[in-house]
């Protein structure tokens, strides 16, 4: 970075938005890295930005993949639009060639029927009706006659000729050059002897040329019925019998790619002035649109009906469209087209210009009238109009849905198209997610090349060769460290994600059947600050709800127990060592708590541990029921507590929040019943259910474990799924065993344990940890195999981790000096208490001192513990346990300190005090007084002695002094002598004269000032 160039900075909220993460999550990570930031709006430098990107690289990669998929989808949509536009152009070009063919065939058919009876009259441009009779091939006529379709005749609409408008039949503009008296639609139907009704015409789809006024020979009406929205055209014809149908030609997306040559046009007289659009009126039938020829000879007469349906379905017509187009192309010879126009006038009398049209030149006809018509209609060739890009852009979505959608089912087809697009999008996103997941290898730390090869789908030989290339010589079963696994996975295009040995060997379970699910009791944890009445509330509930007077029934100290309220409704309470154990369980993923009762003393305040308990409950997604305890005291102030809780984010229902609150007195039992009712209400809202099937392998969570002298390892298990039975083989973490006995909280033996029921389990081979998941296996062999796999991984992990910690410790001590450590051995009654103590002690440390846990275990203090403490210079902390006789004698002999506690907070306070005593004290300078030298005396064998006057303070004989000359320090040391009148004194007060000499310094002068001070040590705090 050059001088004056500012370092680029990033806002935390912008980084979170880029990674699609919560700003609080990014802020918490930045704070963990030791960076001081105030809020999510704070700015960080590039180094911190790099740390965030490296930490959340997986999220960053997922965001990049999502953006890549989105870009590909947009590119694919653009390509689809381009293909649709090209398809539309091809369709328009092909319709230019096919439409004149159909019009020529229709005109020829009309002419052949009406020629014998026609008497042509004079007009500006008279065209014989039989001029195009030979334009229709015989093969096409035979095909149409062979497949007729009968439909009900529809009333024909009469429209005045001057108001005739071009009809638009398609949603897209067709570039065909229209001709006179021709429409680019099919099939055609002639209606005979039908009443004529004058109604408004609807807007058609195809652009059709205007009708040129002809000399009417006879009155007839031609009704043109197209698929979807059709057009009715009334022309002056004299038809003796129904004319054969023209084969239907429907518009389809599957158009021929071949280029159609120009077609010989029909001659016409062009108009000079364009006419304004005529008024459109709706018809009776929306599927029919009619146009009437000029009424010149006394009106129109319907003489017959022509059935043009072929009897085939819409799909078959679409399918055969290409075949018909190819047949027509081979049948007719295509020549150049010329513009055709007509001088039709609108109702306002303005001449309207017709659009150019194309016509097909037929083979040599049998009649000379057709030849004369061809010669008369030759004209000048006109350039085709360009494609209207605006129309294509406006109708591109409809083009994608289906170009030939005119059957009235457009909404359904659009819906199906939308659903199909959604499915394709979901499939693409799922494929991208699967591809991303396939590139992630979930592996345990210190895995072997053989295990890593199986996970990545390659051979172990490839991994060993890659290790050789990296300078590592390994065998197939040798354990790799974390850095090597990450590097090897990256070389093969994978990303390593490390999981614990329990997650790597997790037992897959089937989904619970609906018929096996039943309502289960809620699991409630009581949390709160120390001395706020948590233990008192538990004691009252147990005394009032547990059955008393049972023979030999002594309430056991367990981590969970069950009470019955309202006759048959049960609640399970967790008696954990506090919120520390709750945090440990949540960290292991054991969400065993359904509801949290937050106890707050009404005569106190919301303490920091109360806030911490609230945060733990919210992070676990557990509802909170607030219990305001000690309400019977005179100094109780519930409103103040409610206000403080609202500031902490817990707004009770009375104040418009969602958290229930109950005022209680744990000692007098006030409000306890109402509190239980609110807990049950919260449980009903959550609809807690459990699997009670005996066929399902049971599972549960270890609440706590202890070592009983007569029973061995005893663990308290909270069943979560299935039914736990005596004799079931199981695995819990790295421990295994077989259920030898089940006991409830009163020590009574039971045979079955159901969901949400706490039970004491006997039969563990090793002591499990609190929070481990107990899973019942199908056989003892399966349980042993699974436990051995976990134990191997754990031993390797512990061995590598301990070695690495020692090396790190050596490097740290070389870099920072020797750190003072307080070695501690913990023995407790339960595993849950040990974990709570260990977590609390590890938090008490700073850069100079810390707690080093030498050993921790469950059970009484033994001789082995004493010997270990003596060898490592450690202290022993006994939590609710005592040493045996031999251990006590050995501790007295070794002069070893053993501390006994029953409250976890007392342990933390004493250890914190001990660590503070190990800290180096802070040194402060305390000023005592100042002396001014006013005269110098020369004493033999002593040197210069100053005659002084004490300006302020008190100067003791043993004080440290500094000599100042003109405000500059000249000397710092101690006094050699302090006298008054030849007598040595211990101190001289302010306002007195004295004589002094400095130790090892003789250069003093009149006017110098001597300051007296001393160094004071101050005790440091953690």
Swiss-Prot record:
Residues 575-578 are annotated as: G3. Residues 82-129, 342-436 are annotated as: Disordered. This is Translation initiation factor IF-2. Residues 104-115 have a biased composition (Low complexity). Residues 82-94, 421-436 have a biased composition (Basic and acidic residues). Its main location: cytoplasm. Residues 528-535 are annotated as: G1. Keywords: Cytoplasm, GTP-binding, Initiation factor, Nucleotide-binding, Protein biosynthesis. Belongs to the TRAFAC class translation factor GTPase superfamily. Classic translation factor GTPase family. IF-2 subfamily. Residues 519-689 form the tr-type G domain. One of its GO terms (cellular component) is cytoplasm. InterPro entries: EF-G-like_DII (IPR053905), IF2_II (IPR044145), IF2_N (IPR006847), P-loop_NTPase (IPR027417), Small_GTP-bd (IPR005225), T_Tr_GTP-bd_dom (IPR000795), TF_IF2_bacterial-like (IPR000178), TIF_IF2 (IPR015760). GTP binds at residues 528-535, 575-579, 629-632. Residues 629-632 are annotated as: G4. The gene is infB. It holds the Pfam family IF-2. GO terms for molecular function: GTP binding; GTPase activity; translation initiation factor activity.
């Amino acid at each position: 970075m050059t001088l004056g160039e500012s370092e680029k900075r990033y806002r935390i909220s912008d980084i979170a938005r880029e990674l699609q993460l919560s700003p609080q999550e990014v802020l918490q990570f930045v704070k963990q890295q030791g960076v001081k930031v105030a809020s999510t709006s704070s700015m960080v430098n590039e180094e911190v930005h790099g740390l965030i990107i490296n930490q959340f690289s997986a999220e960053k990669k997922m965001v990049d993949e999502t953006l890549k998929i989105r870009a590909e989808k947009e590119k694919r949509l653009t390509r689809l639009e381009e293909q649709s536009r090209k398809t539309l152009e091809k369709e328009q070009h092909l319709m230019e060639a096919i439409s004149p063919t159909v019009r020529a065939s229709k005109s020829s058919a009309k002419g052949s029927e009406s020629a014998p009876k026609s008497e042509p009259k004079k007009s500006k441009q008279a065209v014989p009706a039989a001029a195009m009779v030979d334009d229709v091939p015989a093969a096409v006529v035979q095909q149409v006659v062979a497949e007729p379709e009968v439909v009900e005749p529809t009333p024909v609409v009469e429209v005045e000729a001057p108001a005739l408008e071009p009809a638009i039949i398609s949603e897209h503009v067709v570039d065909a050059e229209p001709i006179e008296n021709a429409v680019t639609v099919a099939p055609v139907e002639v209606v005979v002897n039908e009443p004529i009704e004058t109604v408004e015409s609807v807007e058609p789809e195809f652009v059709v040329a205007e009708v040129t006024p002809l000399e009417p020979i006879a009155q007839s009406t031609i009704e043109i019925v197209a698929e979807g929205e059709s057009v009715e055209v009334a022309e002056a014809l004299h038809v003796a019998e129904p004319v054969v149908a023209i084969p239907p030609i429907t518009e389809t997306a599957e158009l021929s790619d071949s280029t159609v040559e120009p077609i010989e046009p029909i001659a016409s007289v062009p108009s000079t002035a364009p006419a304004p659009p005529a008024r459109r009126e709706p018809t009776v039938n929306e599927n029919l649109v009619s146009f009437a020829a000029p009424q010149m000879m006394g009106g129109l007469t319907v003489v017959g009906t022509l059935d043009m349906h072929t009897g085939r379905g819409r799909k078959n017509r679409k399918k055969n469209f290409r075949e018909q187009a190819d047949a027509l192309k081979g049948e007719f010879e295509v020549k150049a087209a010329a513009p055709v126009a007509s001088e039709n006038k609108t109702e306002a009398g303005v001449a309207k210009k017709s659009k150019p049209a194309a016509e097909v030149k037929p083979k040599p006809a049998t009649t000379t009238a057709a030849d004369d018509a061809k010669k008369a209609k030759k004209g000048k060739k006109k350039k085709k109009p360009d494609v209207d890009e605006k129309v294509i852009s406006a109708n591109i979505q409809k083009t994608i849905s289906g170009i030939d959608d005119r059957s009235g089912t457009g909404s359904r087809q659009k819906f199906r198209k939308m659903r199909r697009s959604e499915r394709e999008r979901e499939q693409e996103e799922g494929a991208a997610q699967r591809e991303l997941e396939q590139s992630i290898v979930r592996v345990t730390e210190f895995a072997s090349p053989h295990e890593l090869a199986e996970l990545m789908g390659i051979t172990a030989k490839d991994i060993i060769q890659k290790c050789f290339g990296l300078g590592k010589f390994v065998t197939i079963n040798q354990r790799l460290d974390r850095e090597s696994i990450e590097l090897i996975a990256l070389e093969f295009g994978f990303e390593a994600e490390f999981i614990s040995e329990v997650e790597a060997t997790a037992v897959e379970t089937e989904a619970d059947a609906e018929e096996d699910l039943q309502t289960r009791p809620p699991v409630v944890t009581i949390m709160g600050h120390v001395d706020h009445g948590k233990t008192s509330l538990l004691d009252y509930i147990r005394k009032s709800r547990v059955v008393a007077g049972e023979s030999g029934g002594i309430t056991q100290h367990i981590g969970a127990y069950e009470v019955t309220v309202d006759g048959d409704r049960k609640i399970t309470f967790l008696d954990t060592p506090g919120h520390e154990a709750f945090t440990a369980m949540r960290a292991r993923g054991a969400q065993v708590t359904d509801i949290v009762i937050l106890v707050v003393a009404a005569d106190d305040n919301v303490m920091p541990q109360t806030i911490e308990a609230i945060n733990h409950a919210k992070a676990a997604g557990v509802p909170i029921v607030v219990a305001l305890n000690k309400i019977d005291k005179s100094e109780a102030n519930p409103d103040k507590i409610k206000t403080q809780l609202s500031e902490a984010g817990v707004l009770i229902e009375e104040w418009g929040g969602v958290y229930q609150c109950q005022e209680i007195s744990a000692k007098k039992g006030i409000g306890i019943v109402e509190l239980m009712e609110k807990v049950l209400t919260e449980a009903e809202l959550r609809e807690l259910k459990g699997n009670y099937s005996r066929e399902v392998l049971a599972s549960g969570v270890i609440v706590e474990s202890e070592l009983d002298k007569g029973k061995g390892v005893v663990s308290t298990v909270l069943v979560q799924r299935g039914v736990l039975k005596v004799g079931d083989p199981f695995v819990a973490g790295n421990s295994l065993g077989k259920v030898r006995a089940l006991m409830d909280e009163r020590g009574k033996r039971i045979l079955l344990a159901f969901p949400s029921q706490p039970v004491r389990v006997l039969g563990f081979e090793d002591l499990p940890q609190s929070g481990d998941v107990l899973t019942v296996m199908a056989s003892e062999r399966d349980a042993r195999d699974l436990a051995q796999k976990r134990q191997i991984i754990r031993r390797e992990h512990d061995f590598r981790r301990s070695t690495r910690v020692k090396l790190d410790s050596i490097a740290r001590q070389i870099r920072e000096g020797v750190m003072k450590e307080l070695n501690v051995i913990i023995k407790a009654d339960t595993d849950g208490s040990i974990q709570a103590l260990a977590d609390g002690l590890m938090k008490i440390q700073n850069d100079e001192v810390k707690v080093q846990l030498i050993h921790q275990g469950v059970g009484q203090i033994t001789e082995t513990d004493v010997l270990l403490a003596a060898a490592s210079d450690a202290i022993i902390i006994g939590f609710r346990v005592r040493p045996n006789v031999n251990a006590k004698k050995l501790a007295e002999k070794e002069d070893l300190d053993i501390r006994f506690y029953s409250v976890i907070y007392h342990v933390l306070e004493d250890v914190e005090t001990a660590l503070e005593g190990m800290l180096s004290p802070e040194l402060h300078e305390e000023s005592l007084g100042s002396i001014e030298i006013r005269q110098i005396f020369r004493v033999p064998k002593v040197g210069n002695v100053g005659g002084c006057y004490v300006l302020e303070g008190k100067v003791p004989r043993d004080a440290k002094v500094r000599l100042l000359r003109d405000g500059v320090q000249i000397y710092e040391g101690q006094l050699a002598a302090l006298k008054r009148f030849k007598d040595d004194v211990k101190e001289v007060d302010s306002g007195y004269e004295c004589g002094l000499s400095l130790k090892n310094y003789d250069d003093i002068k009149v006017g110098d000032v001597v300051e007296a001070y001393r160094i004071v040590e101050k005790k440091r705090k953690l």
